[in-house]
């Protein structure tokens, strides 16, 4: 059963990371469009918001993919999913926004699971732990 759990953890990390890597990469390549979207939500300091979004989404997505600092990054991405749902997807009269809100809540649950249980045996975290490498 251990092989099944390891495979599921790896496939889960891959699936969960794709949305964030894709979104973060898009934001990195289109800063003006991202900043305009943030301004449309009446957020202050959109230049910093753009940088934060790129770091959290692209950096966090890559970290989850690799299983690096998985528990901490999982918690950060769970909070990010709730924040972006509350900021950008609360127009429940629009069915599309309702679906995006629920998608964010589902991702929140997945990231909380990652935060609780880690990235599995096939992660950089586990590899470093096996080798006794300190990540401080």
Predicted segments — roles?
Residues 1-29, 47-55, 59, 65-136:
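Extended, low-polarity transmembrane helix blocks
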Residues 29-44:
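Membrane-interface interhelical connector segments
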């Amino acid at each position: 059963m251990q092989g099944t759990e390891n495979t599921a953890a790896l496939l889960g990390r891959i699936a969960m990371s794709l949305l964030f890597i894709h979104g973060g990469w898009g934001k990195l390549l289109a800063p003006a469009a991202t900043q305009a979207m943030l301004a449309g939500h009446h957020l202050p300091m959109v230049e910093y918001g753009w940088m934060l979004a790129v770091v959290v989404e692209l950096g966090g997505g890559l970290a989850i993919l690799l299983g690096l600092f998985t528990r901490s990054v999982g918690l950060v991405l769970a909070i990010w999913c709730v924040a972006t749902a509350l900021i950008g997807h609360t127009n429940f009269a629009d069915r599309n926004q309702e679906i995006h809100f629920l998608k964010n809540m589902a991702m929140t649950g997945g990231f909380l699971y990652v935060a609780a249980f880690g990235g599995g045996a096939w992660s950089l975290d586990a590899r470093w732990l096996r080798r006794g490498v300190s990540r401080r």
